[in-house]
Amino acid sequence: MANPILEQAKENMEKAEASLRRTLGQIRAGRANASLVNRVNVEYYGAMTPLNQIAAITIPEARVLLITPYDKGALEDIEKALYTADIGISPANDGSVIRLVIPQLTGERRKEIAKEVGKEAELAKVVVRNARRDAMDNLKKAEKASEISEDEMHDLEEQVQNLTNEATKKIDAISKDKEKEITEG
């Protein structure tokens, strides 16, 4: 796959998949997951610092996230950052660590989250389809400019379609896995 148009399409499709994984990782599914606090930044000595750089994040139980700061003086700053991050979970500070207890999800909330997962997956598919469309347009332009032959264009179009199908299958699998995680709780 030496064609730059194919490379660009593949890269864009992989970015859509990676973005979906990141987004779904931040959706609370009734289980403790360190990615819930990935986007939390703590004001630490005057600078905004990612939480995972100033504290160890562990999962001692299925529904408990344990945050142990490397510097005990940062405990209150971390707690404040968790409150302001609006992750939907109240931190419990016991003086040396912070516990985030993930509440059990109700059936109704599970359905809402599953719908949200579906919407995010559909957005990722739109990005994939846009990458496909852009690649097809670029192939047609290249053919009109006599940079590639008609046969090459058809072969490349087929490869772009295969990339699209592959990316869509991956997105569906990621989405199904997350929905399964949510419904099983």
From Swiss-Prot:
Keywords: Cytoplasm, Protein biosynthesis. Residues 163-185 are annotated as: Disordered. One of its GO terms (molecular function) is ribosomal large subunit binding. It comes from the Bacteria. One of its GO terms (cellular component) is cytoplasm. InterPro entries: Ribosome_recyc_fac (IPR002661), Ribosome_recyc_fac_dom (IPR023584), RRF_sf (IPR036191). One of its GO terms (biological process) is translational termination. It is found in: Cytoplasm. Its main location: cytoplasm. Residues 167-185 have a biased composition (Basic and acidic residues). Responsible for the release of ribosomes from messenger RNA at the termination of protein biosynthesis. May increase the efficiency of translation by recycling ribosomes from one round of translation to another. PANTHER family: MITOCHONDRIAL RIBOSOME RECYCLING FACTOR PSEUDO 1, RIBOSOME RECYCLING FACTOR. NCBIfam families: frr. Belongs to the RRF family. This is Ribosome-recycling factor. It comes from Latilactobacillus sakei subsp. sakei (strain 23K) (Lactobacillus sakei subsp. sakei). The gene is frr.
